[in-house]
């Protein structure tokens, strides 16, 4: 996972704030009054273990969301390529129908790319004959609308006797898989992790950082600044990364390369058309 300048800025700000807190405690300890309050070391260790467990679930959940998004997009791309090869093999003598279906599959993949990022714009699609792109923009779910149009064209080809029953079933399976993988993407997009859990975790980290100096201030002195810097870099960094990857389809550097995957799918389908 790469660091971006906003991430570094947030890390630096967090470290500076916690260091300012420690400097204040150190100043009070040495210049105003002696702080007799000491947190037992075992309590610090126990709280540290609890935080480690909380972060394990936090980072693990975010990574699994990222990985599930990658799998869904990969399966969609593989399904699009499989559909394109089947269409190419079944409709070699019907160039117009073949180009229509393959262009529509590219449109479907483009619409998925946009939908998972909260965009719905028919201007990003490839015009195909009488395809009502303007009407598609008004749909609540453009990918599903395009997928339905692909299914309708397959039904028409079978009714007209241009593809066999076996070919019809095979192509219909690909269309159904499109809907299944799209549903996974929509679930990831519309079901973020519970905010209460995240707020609870951040509050616990701040509480832990607040009591650490009272456990080691008499033993480490100014070296506590280095200890707290490393601690906050580690935990705050993990939280920021978790926050980024929990939305796998975003525009952050650590999010999935949705545009690159879409271009790769289009490149493969275009190669099939030209073959």
Residue ranges and their predicted role:
Residues 1-74, 93, 220-222, 239, ...:
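N-terminal juxtamembrane/topogenic regions of multi-pass membrane proteins
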Residues 6-15, 186-222:
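Transmembrane alpha-helical segments and their cytosolic interface motifs
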Residues 19, 51-54, 176, 204-208, ...:
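Residue-level signal for the membrane-embedded core of alpha-helical transmembrane segments
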Residues 49, 215-239, 243:
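Pore-lining and gate-forming transmembrane alpha-helices of multi-pass membrane transport proteins
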Residues 69, 178, 191-194, 203, ...:
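Membrane-interface junctions
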Residues 74-91:
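Amphipathic, membrane-active segments
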Residues 86-197:
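Structured inter-helical modules in multipass membrane proteins
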Residues 232, 236, 241-275:
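Cytosolic/matrix-facing juxtamembrane and C-terminal tails of multi-pass cellular membrane proteins
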């Amino acid at each position: 996972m790469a660091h971006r300048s906003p991430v570094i800025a947030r890390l630096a700000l967090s470290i500076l704030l916690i260091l300012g807190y420690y400097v204040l405690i150190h100043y009070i300890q040495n210049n105003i009054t002696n702080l007799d309050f000491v947190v037992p070391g075992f309590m610090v260790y126990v709280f540290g273990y609890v935080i480690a467990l909380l972060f394990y679930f936090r980072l693990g959940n975010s990574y699994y969301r990222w990985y599930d998004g990658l799998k869904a997009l990969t399966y969609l791309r593989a399904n699009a390529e499989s559909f394109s090869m089947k269409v190419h093999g079944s409709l070699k003598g019907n160039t117009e129908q073949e180009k229509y279906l393959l262009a529509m599959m590219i449109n479907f993949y483009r619409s998925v790319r946009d939908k998972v990022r909260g965009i719905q714009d028919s201007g990003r699609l490839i015009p195909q004959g009488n395809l009502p792109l303007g009407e598609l923009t008004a749909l609540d779910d453009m990918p599903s609308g395009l997928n339905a149009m692909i299914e309708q064209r397959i039904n028409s080809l079978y009714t007209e006797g241009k593809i066999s029953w076996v070919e019809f079933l095979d192509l219909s399976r690909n269309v159904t898989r499109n809907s299944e993988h799209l549903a996974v993407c929509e679930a990831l997009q519309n079901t973020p992790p519970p905010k209460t859990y995240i707020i609870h975790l951040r509050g616990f980290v701040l509480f832990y950082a607040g009591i650490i100096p009272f456990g080691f201030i008499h033993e480490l002195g100014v070296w506590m600044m280095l200890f707290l810097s490393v601690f906050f870099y580690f935990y705050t960094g993990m939280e920021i990364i978790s926050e980024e990857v929990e939305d796998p389809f975003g525009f952050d550097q650590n999010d999935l390369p949705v545009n690159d995957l879409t271009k790769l799918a289009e490149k493969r389908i275009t190669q099939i058309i030209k073959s």
